[in-house]
Amino acid sequence: MADCLKIADTANKGRLTDDELDEIITELNAEKKERIAANKVDQIESAIFDKGLLIAKEAEIARKIEKRNRYMNILKEQKLMALTERANEMTGDPSLGLEAALVGVNAPFEGATRSVDSLTNGVFLSYSGGLIADLRKANLLVKFNNMKGDFEKQVANVLGDLNRKNPLGVPNASSDAKALGKILFKYQRAATQRLNQAGAYIRLKEGRVVRASHDQRRMVKVGLDEWKAYIRDKLDYKKMGIAPERIDGFLDSAYEAIVTGVRKDPKGQAITEVNEISRAFKGPANLAKKESAQSVLTFKTPNDWYDYDQKFGRASLREAFMQDLQSSARSTALMEVLGTNPQAMVDRVRRRLEKKYRGDARKLKRITRERAAITFEAALAEVTGEVNFGSHTTMARVFHFIRSIQTMAKLGGAFISAFSDIAYISSNRLYQGRSLMDAWGDAFSAVFKGMKRGEMRDFADRLGVGLEGQLGDFMSRFNASDDVPGQTSKYLATFFKLNLLQPWTESNKRGVTLMIANDLGREATKRFDKLPDDLRRILGTYGIDQKGWELARKGAKKGPDGRMYLIPGEIPDLKIRENVFALLVSEADNSVPSPGARERAIMRRGYRPGTDAGEAIRFLFQFKSFGITALTKGVGRHMYGYGAKTKREQLMRGVGANMGIINTIVGTTVLGYFVMQF
């Protein structure tokens, strides 16, 4: 091997690193050994030549990907700097532009709410809304939600078969399993294609079911050796490109990466989703696989994947599939806004802002976020999901259980107190341009509009709103959300369903979304400059300008009730479609106060579970998320959402200009008094 490396290095002339050369030679040797083992010595030369051609082809693709991503990152950096300039022009605070890109802000400059957070929710709920609607239409929703045992394994095999270049079919699978597998494959493929458009390079994984999920608690409990012994014979190392002599090292690094949440490159440097989502691979073979723990685990058969998932994963194909969709949506949003290296992009924009405004002490203080409610580090940790690393530790599990018991003990009557949502709905409808009487009429009727069944329910699902119960994410309305999967979380989901808070919230969100989509549909015949000022302002904050509106209004269609709606799925332009999805989802969360990444960044400050500070802050803010959200999304929007730089400036504009704030305070006070009578 050393002689080969020396010869190759001489010919290489420094174009590849020693690690990359070593990897290529290892691959060629593995091909040679495989031919010898199969008694095909006469084919060794041609096989090695073919393998070399494949590596060369992959190297060329890698160079093209790297070039594409460099160009995309330059454009995204320019857009971010333009966003900070717009923020500076309107508010005098350029740092709000970077905050807007991460978690969104209330100031109404263009792009202020088109954030990583809103896009993540928009993309994910566009997938999940369509998925749920398709499952309901095929009468498979109940089976999807309750998959287990032999039926679940059949669906896994169907999904794995569809992920082949030439599907062979699964003869022993039932008709329901085949139909369900096809629906899941439709959205899995859509998510993969969208990721590739955003900057990734993900090829078809032969026989793949879904991305492997891992229960770190179980893995830590059994230890490295037992985990390796169990998974060793279930993985297809040839498809992953792992040479036989490197299997042990790969499994060691995979175990460390999974239980710690920190992946490492061959040199031992940490690689996380923050700083590397879609690596522009510089080594030829690295395009097809990475030897480090960032490689995707590929199982030999769907049954091998299923057995592993039952023992060390989510133990649920449904949960693993939805987790895969959510991860894809998050990565798509991160790359769309921050490029292929989010951490580096945030750092670079900050440095440029510090250099640009180094002579302005007030702006520089805001850029460095001294004593600020939201730091860029905390915001980035929220949108990447890294703030949840450590949720598998014993400390995190125990305290999560305690908080869950407290939640069920103290929020039994939360449904009654949720009547105050009506006031927030009316206030947000005021911001959207409705009159005071119309806004309150909309607020009282929203829940009834959202309770409709049949075609209207299917139609509402495809808008991607009011799906929290289906997706198992509900307690975050009232808690500083800590996503710890397990039986306790399932009990909480059942609890909120039984105390009626879940159906109340979902119905209100569906109703509000139908109203907003109807507003947009009615105005779709008008040019952008002819739209009402309030509607034009809202569209602008989601990145929909005059050109975008011309594309968006092509999606206006009649709904099942005969009314005109702007349907995101009918919009031909992909990015405008996602912006409209983000608008609908975010406006529903503003109307029925639901915390987003911005509110969680304020509460959790970037501290992870399983640490002293992380657990303390989660207890401190356990029942504070609703109040904080009401201030940031309710009052805050009316205070800063019309362009005022300070509270004083907005309040000095008079009663009419502050009707939203007055309506929120008076409405919640009256409804709160009403609730206290029960």
Region roles according to the model:
Residues 149, 207, 268, 561-562, ...:
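Intrinsic-disorder/low-complexity loop/linker signature
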Residues 296-416, 420-677:
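Hydrophobic, often aromatic-rich secondary-structure segments at membrane interfaces
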Residues 141, 145-256, 424-427, 457-464, ...:
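Structured, mid-chain assembly/scaffold modules that mediate subunit interfaces
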Residues 168-173, 187, 195, 202, ...:
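Short linear interaction motifs
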